[in-house]
Amino acid sequence: AAAVPMLLGLSISGVSMVGSDTGGFQEDASAQLFARWFSFSAFTPYFRSHSADDTRPHEPWSFGKNVLDISRHYLRLRYSLIPYIYSAFYRAETEAEPVMKPLFFEWPQDKRLAEVNDEYLFGPHLLAAPVTSPDTLWRHVYLPQGTWYDFWDDTLYHGSSDYLVAAPIEKLPLFVRAGSILPNETARMHTDAERSPVLFLDVYPDENGQACGELYCDAEEGWGYRRGEYSLISFTFQAGSLEVTCENEGFTPPWNDLEVRVHEGIPAAADAADPEEAFTAD
């Protein structure tokens, strides 16, 4: 539980490349702890699994098929989001914008957020709410101002409100800010592997039907980007149309095709004012 506020503190102190040793290196992680830890770490800037000589094996497959499947799922998701994450690091490099930041950093006027240290923004558009307690199937979240999409099923939530959301072992509560465009690609085995030719843009319109996002890409090695050898592309979605603007064209993007996926959103069934109505139990 301490990992989230620790990483957020480092992030706003100017250290953007932060992460935790997934699985730990003291004592033995349980299958449940490792699965939760792995899903959380997939949404941190620095992501790696860890073990030690005097602990049980902490490789994902050492905890059984269920944990292995969960680990594979989040690893693939992480790799598919490389264009989004890499673009967030561009802002960290040029503007000292934290890749992972506490919510009060973005909404300082919301006094509730001064007490929230277990949710955070990952990049400009994703809000992660990791599960840090054992044997948990539901998770309380407070969503800041605006409208939010559930990343997994496109349920819409109104901000400045509390919710109780389902959080089974395989699900990290994850939300997308309305008005966002997420660039992503087909997951690869490793970052040196050949890319799929298709760049995906997932569009999450706000209440006015608008959304925006950006994509940064370069050679991913060397210092050429400091000589202008990079591409910076902005996307604007409005009235059902997408506008693409190249702000810098010093590098040829590695994708040949563009596929746009517009998310419509499904209104949440539960009343935000009474999170207990989010579920019933016999």
Placement of each model-derived feature along the sequence:
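Accessory, solvent-exposed terminal regions and/or long lumenal/extracellular loops of proteins
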Residues: K171-D274
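Intrinsic disorder/low-structure terminal segments
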Residues: Y46, F104, S234-T236, G250, ...
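Catalytic-domain carbohydrate-binding cleft regions of carbohydrate-active enzymes
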Residues: A1-E170, R177, E221
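Compositionally biased, non-globular sequence tracts
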Residues: A273-A281
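Compositionally biased, intrinsically disordered low-complexity regions enriched in proline and serine
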Residues: S87, D150, H158, L164, ...
